[in-house]
C-alpha cells in the first residue's frame, strides 16, 4: 500500500507530498472505506468528529416576535436604545370561515321554519277537531237518520246489486216489461212526473231563514222545513224497503226451448228517460240489453226480444 501511494504522489508533485504528510499525521483514520456506507445501521466508516466540525446552517425563526439584533454596541445604554427602536410586530387577526351576519341569518331562518311548522300543525289540529265536532253533533242530534236510507243507497241495496255499473235514477221505472212500446211509454211518464216534483228546501248555515230577503228588508215567516225523518216515514221498516226495491227492479226471466235453450234469471235495472233498458244477468252479473239477454239464454237473434222475456211479480229468492 505504501509503494502505491508513493507512486501516485510522484505524479502529484507538491500536492502529492502534502497529501502524504497529511496521511501520516492522520494515522489509521484515513484508511480507504470499502463498505460504501450501505449498512442498515448507519455508515461504519464515518468520522463523527469531522462531521461535527463542519459549519452548520443557522435556522431562521418563524416567530415574528423573535428577531436577531445587530451586535455592535456591546452592553449598556447602546443595547437599550436598539431594543426600544425596534418596532413591535402587529398582532395577527384570526380569520373566520363564516361572518357574523350569515350566522344570524341562519338562526333567523331556522326560527322561521320552526314557526311555519308549528302553524301548519295547529291548522291540521283545528281541521281535525272541527271534523270530529261535526260528526259528534250529527250523532247527538238523533243518531243515524232514517232519511239517509231513501236518499243514498244502503248496504242492503249494494249487496243486492251484482255490479256497480250503469247510472241510477231517483224515479221509479216501469212495473214490468210486457210489450216494448207500452213499457217505454210508462217509464217516460213516470220519469216526467218525478222530475216535476219540487225538491225539499235545504236549511241554511245561518239558522232559521232559508230564502232570500225581500227588497224592503222585512223578513217573512217561512213555513217549517220538512226534515228527512218526516219525508221517509213510509220506508221505516225493512219489509217496505224490500217491497219498494222489488217494484223498482222486478225480476225477469227468459226461457228458450230447444237443444241449446235454457232459463236465465235476471232483474230489470233502473234507467233514466231516453236510456236503453238494461237487464242484469244473475248468473254472471253482466248488464245486457233485452236482445242480448234472450241471446244469452240460447234463443239467438230474434225480432222482438221483449216478447220472450217474462216478468215475475212474486217475491224473488234473491231479495
Swiss-Prot record:
Keyword Nucleus: yes
Recorded family membership: Belongs to the Ninja family.
UniProt feature, compositional bias: Low complexity: 225-234
Swiss-Prot/TrEMBL GO biological process terms: negative regulation of DNA-templated transcription; signal transduction
Gly residues: bias regions: 70-79
UniProt entry keywords in alphabetical sequence: Nucleus
Chain ranges passing through the membrane: none
Any single Gene Ontology cellular-component annotation: nucleus
Name used for this protein in its record: Ninja-family protein Os07g0602900
A Pfam family assignment: EAR
Region called Disordered, residue ranges: 1-26, 69-152, 181-234
Bias type Basic and acidic residues, positions: 105-118
Keyword Zinc-finger annotated: no
Extent of Polar residues compositional bias: 185-196
Subcellular location: Nucleus
Amino acid at each position: 500500500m505504501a509503494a502505491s501511494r508513493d507512486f501516485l504522489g510522484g505524479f502529484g508533485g507538491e500536492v502529492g507530498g502534502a497529501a502524504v504528510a497529511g496521511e501520516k499525521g492522520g494515522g489509521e483514520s484515513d484508511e480507504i472505506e470499502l463498505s460504501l456506507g450501505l449498512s442498515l445501521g448507519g455508515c461504519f466508516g464515518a468520522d463523527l468528529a469531522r462531521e461535527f466540525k463542519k459549519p452548520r446552517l443557522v435556522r431562521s425563526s418563524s416567530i415574528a416576535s423573535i428577531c436577531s439584533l445587530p451586535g455592535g454596541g456591546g452592553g449598556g445604554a447602546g443595547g437599550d436604545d436598539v431594543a426600544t427602536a425596534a418596532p413591535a410586530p402587529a398582532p395577527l387577526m384570526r380569520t373566520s370561515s363564516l361572518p357574523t351576519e350569515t350566522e344570524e341569518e341562519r338562526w333567523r331562518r331556522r326560527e322561521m321554519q320552526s314557526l311555519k311548522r308549528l302553524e301548519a300543525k295547529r291548522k291540521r289540529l283545528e281541521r281535525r277537531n272541527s271534523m270530529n265536532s261535526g260528526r259528534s253533533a250529527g250523532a247527538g242530534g238523533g243518531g243515524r237518520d232514517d232519511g239517509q236510507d231513501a236518499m243514498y243507497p244502503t248496504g242492503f241495496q249494494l249487496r243486492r246489486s251484482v255490479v256497480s255499473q250503469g247510472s241510477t235514477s231517483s224515479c221509479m221505472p216501469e212495473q214490468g216489461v210486457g210489450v216494448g212500446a207500452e213499457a217505454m211509454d210508462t217509464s217516460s211518464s213516470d220519469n216526467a212526473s218525478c222530475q216535476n216534483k219540487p225538491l225539499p228546501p235545504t236549511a241554511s248555515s245561518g239558522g232559521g231563514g232559508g230564502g232570500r230577503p225581500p227588497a224592503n228588508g222585512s223578513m217573512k215567516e217561512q213555513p217549517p222545513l220538512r226534515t228527512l225523518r218526516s219525508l221517509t216515514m213510509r220506508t221505516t221498516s225493512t219489509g217496505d224497503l224490500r217491497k219498494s226495491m222489488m217494484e223498482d227492479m222486478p225480476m225477469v226471466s227468459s226461457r228458450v226451448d230447444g237443444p241449446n235453450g235454457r232459463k236465465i234469471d235476471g232483474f230489470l235495472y233502473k234507467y233514466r228517460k231516453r236510456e236503453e233498458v238494461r237487464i242484469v244477468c244473475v248468473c254472471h252479473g253482466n248488464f245486457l240489453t233485452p236482445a242480448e239477454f234472450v241471446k244469452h239464454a240460447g234463443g239467438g237473434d230474434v225480432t222482438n226480444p221483449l216478447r220472450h222475456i217474462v216478468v215475475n211479480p212474486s217475491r224473488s229468492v234473491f231479495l
